[in-house]
């Protein structure tokens, strides 16, 4: 883009005159995106932006003054009234979901540097769904959204039991602990997934290259995991009904508690190996241990499978 066009674009989006726009671009190395972010921080963008938008309920609280001052951290609270589902779309940075003793929902985001409004998360409540997106959509800030790494923390009341929780990320690492829900869906590209003591009737995880680790999850439910090259580890596997894992080249390890009554395993692979330290009957592709109450289905191309007990 020529300098003249960049000046014109900056003038369209800000309250700057021609010489001011030229000076702003020169100070930012003629990088239009950086200039826009700088002018947004200075409050010279045209129009207004609200990082927290709600249709049915407004945040019950805001970030503490010291957090608002440096611009790196924002905190927002929601009442649980009317919220039946939670959806989070987080592009880059760690995301942590857990319970706490307060009776409100709390969301915290923290950047490695001060965040412009267009880089901050947006929270909306509509038709019973609390939706959190990484940043405002569209325009010149698309590239910045992908490059800005931010940490998200979600705290839910211990008494809350959402009907569904959907978590989506690109390179975000997810940690989910002690959450209760009817259905939890987690999808990521290169991020890692750690779930501990998650109580869900239906647990679905899809990952491309990041590893997935589950510990003591879904005691009364079923779990489905799909991955391409990421490894899958199920520690202290207390899944009640069934677990299915589909992997291309990632290895799969399932560790059952010592008091597990048994399992029925079906393993389909092209070249992957299977190792079991648990006494079983049957063949390499169909094994039975104990009463066979837990159904395990594992499909891989070259990924191996290990089954053990604590």
Question: Residue spans of the language-model regions?
Answer:
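Short, surface-exposed interaction patches in beta-rich subdomains
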Residues: 203, 213-310
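Short, amphipathic alpha-helical interaction segments embedded in low-complexity terminal/linker regions
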Residues: 1-78, 82-83, 104-108, 113-117
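Short beta-strand "wing" residues that participate in macromolecule-binding interfaces
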Residues: 47, 97, 254
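Right-handed parallel beta-helix
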Residues: 73-85, 94-96, 118-202, 211-220, ...
């Amino acid at each position: 883009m020529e300098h003249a066009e960049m000046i014109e674009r900056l003038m369209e989006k800000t309250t700057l005159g021609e010489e001011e726009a030229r000076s702003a671009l020169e100070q930012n190395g003629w990088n239009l995106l950086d200039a826009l972010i700088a002018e947004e921080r200075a409050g010279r963008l045209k129009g207004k932006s609200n990082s927290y938008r709600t249709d049915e309920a407004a945040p019950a609280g805001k970030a503490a003054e010291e957090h608002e001052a440096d611009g790196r951290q924002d905190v927002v609270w929601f009442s649980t009234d009317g919220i039946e589902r939670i959806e989070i779309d987080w592009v880059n940075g760690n995301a942590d979901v857990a319970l706490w003793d307060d009776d409100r929902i709390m969301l915290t985001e923290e950047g490695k540097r001060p965040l412009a409004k267009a880089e901050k998360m947006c929270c909306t409540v509509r038709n019973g769904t609390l939706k959190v997106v990484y940043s405002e959509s569209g325009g010149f800030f698309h590239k910045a959204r992908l490059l800005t790494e931010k940490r998200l923390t979600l705290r839910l009341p211990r008494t809350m039991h959402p009907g569904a929780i959907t978590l989506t990320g690109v390179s975000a690492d997810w940690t989910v602990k002690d959450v209760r829900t009817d259905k939890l869906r987690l999808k990521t590209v290169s991020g890692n997934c750690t779930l501990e003591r998650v109580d869900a009737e239906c647990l679905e995880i899809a990952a491309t290259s990041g590893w997935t680790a589950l510990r003591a999850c879904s005691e009364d439910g079923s779990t489905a995991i799909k991955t391409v090259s990421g490894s899958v580890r199920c520690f202290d596997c207390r899944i009640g009904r069934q677990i299915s894992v589909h992997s291309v080249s990632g290895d799969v390890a399932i560790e059952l508690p010592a008091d597990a009554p048994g399992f029925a395993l079906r393993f389909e692979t092209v070249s992957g190996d299977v190792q079991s330290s648990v006494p079983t009957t049957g063949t390499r592709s169909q094994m039975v241990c104990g009463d066979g109450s837990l159904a395990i289905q594992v499909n891989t191309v070259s990924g191996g499978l290990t089954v053990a007990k604590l």
